[in-house]
Amino acid sequence: ELAARIVSAEPLAVSWVETRTDTEMKEFEALVQVTHDIIAEAFSSKVITPGKTTSEEVVWWLRQKVRDMGLDTWFHPTVDIQRDSEALKSHIEAFSNGYEETVIQPGDLLHCDFGVSYLGLNTDCQQHAYVPFPGEKQVPEFLSQAFASGNRVQDLFTDSFGYGLTGNSILRTALEKGRAEGLRPSI
């Protein structure tokens, strides 16, 4: 008869792990900023020389930079190269596959996944950077449009959040809304 009164403690455990103090949240915001600052330096001409630097060299620069700061990486970072090497009907398709060749070249779109650990807090940041051709002053229009579409998908996803909804239903709703707007959403 008492067995019917037993309930799972999982929600309590998850809530405990998710709970952060105001001080922890301030430290977390600072840690996120540090993470973005490290990525900005990694993607700068201080670290990358197009035609010479490899994506793996940038990965190891990230790891060393974090160690030099007395921090730890949360996971092994990645730096992927996405390259428009062919004339295609859709530039988006050209940038949808990574390449095994690792030397960073002008015209490449770089993507990193990088996280830092400090005081039991962990960041997980993904960021892109475009490597301009000599004399190029702006990102190509097709990349600007692709990022705007990606941001729209993010908005559709977060707009689909709601109390009591499952992750799968939120995902399904966001994907349906994206397709209805003529996007090719992938979450």
Regions found by a protein language model. Name each.
Residues 1-187:
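Active-site neighborhoods and metal-handling regions in enzymes and metal-associated proteins
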